[in-house]
Amino acid sequence: MESVIFSINGEIIQVNKEIITASPYNLFKRIQDHHLKDEAIILNGINYHAFESLLDYMRWKKINITINNVEMILVAAIIIDVPPVVDLCVKTMIHNINSTNCIRMFNFSKRYGIKKLYNASMSEIINNITAVTSDPEFGKLSKDELTTILSHENVNVNHEDVTAIILLKWIHKNPNDVDIINILHPKFMTNAMRNAIALLGLTISKSTKPVTRNGIKHNIVVIKNSDYISTITHYSPRTEYWTIVGNTDRQFYNANVLHNCLYIIGGMINNRHVYSVSRVDLKTKKWKTVTNMSSLKSEVSTCVNNGKLYVIGGLEFSISTAVAEYLKHGASKWIRLPNLITPRYSGASVFVNDDIYVMGGVYTTYEKYVVLNDVECFTKNRWIKKSPMPRHHSIVYAVEYDGDIYAITGITHETRNYLYKYIVNEDKWIELYMYFNHVGKMFVCSCGDYILIIADAKYEYYPKSNTWNLLDTSTRNIEYYDMFTKDETPKCNVTHKSLPSFLSNCEKKFLQ
């Protein structure tokens, strides 16, 4: 029986010539055409045992592929050009891909040009980017590869600070490619992380590129009323799905988002005032009743800053209150601030540079009902008066934008809506063009380049150009609307001294 001799890494294997003759694969066809009997055919880059497995497949159409031998069989199948075995090996590798081996499989797929494996391993890296940073091979990704990964719309980061920590870890291994930092969008980062990057001597250039990472975009939480029960829904920009988080039966409450939790504050249940505060985790959907406020009240004003929920003013039965207090997320005790100069409810409160500004609302007692234009600022542990609003307004909504305050007024006794800008450094109010009119209740959110207003319709206001954009979207039955980013960055006053500790804590928090 004639044989064909193969030499693999110095080892000899003889193959029945009938197997070679019957083979439809390219390598063996060429052997049939050109092989001289007495010559040993040298095969380079192939494992001896993998070649034996391929011969078994050609004889019996069966092959034993495991996670331990799949790579060497796949290499042999690619070199010898046995497409069915290539497909079986690729399927095995894709089936067994995970966060601990996806970078190795990614590199393997590039080396041998295996598109399906490349796509699957890239997808695994994108879905597990925070985990794969612990792989020693992570630092060997090229600048272009990491840019592609972190620019993917579905990369699994939920805040731009996470992207920053991933980049800083990679830059530590690739100090000549620090300009990769320019893929960051500073407006989505916390002040602490921006300060940390500046202290490292890195500069993020201003970019006009669109934001591609869906996970860092604003999440949305909406409460809609229906037959005395309000439904809470949450929209994730990464999954692009709305999910029902829970329900509440309160009226005249206020709400705010802090550390990925929605707080429902005060209000009334069955026409009775309450001082309880409920919290729902928007990720786990678990509810918790947190420590009660100091008194029963509704129509409070709220704002959040530095991991704390601030509750200001409100209506205690029929009397407006001057009480101001805050609760640190995860704490069990409310801390009282000095009382407001003027008690009020349904006004607006907003933080600018760690100072609280409170404006408008109603001062009421059993004998009085006064619509306010007063503005107060809490700074250096005391309330001081600021320039009043141009008009008296019972309902005010306000947001901070680029260091100033933009206030939009609702309607109760007023005849129209107004838009104002308060220039903080000049203590000065100016009136701006108002696009819509005759709207009572609304919600206002600062969204990077624009301010979003949910009123009788959805509006975008662009402060830099003083222009409006109307979005054709239903806003019926909305009781609460807010946009937020998932901020889990450790709180820290970042200095040269605290920088190493801050970055270490961020890495422990973000990269698993």
From Swiss-Prot:
Kelch repeats: 216-261, 262-307, 309-354, 356-403, 405-449, 452-498
Domain of life of the organism encoding this protein: Viruses
UniProt keyword list: Kelch repeat, Repeat
Entry-linked InterPro entries: BACK, BTB/POZ_dom, Kelch-typ_b-propeller, Kelch_1, SKP1/BTB/POZ_sf
One Pfam family it belongs to: Kelch_1
BTB domain residues: 2-67
Domain BACK: 102-176
Family from the record: Belongs to the poxviruses Kelch family.
Protein name according to UniProt: Kelch repeat protein C2
Lineage per the UniProt record: Viruses, Varidnaviria, Bamfordvirae, Nucleocytoviricota, Pokkesviricetes
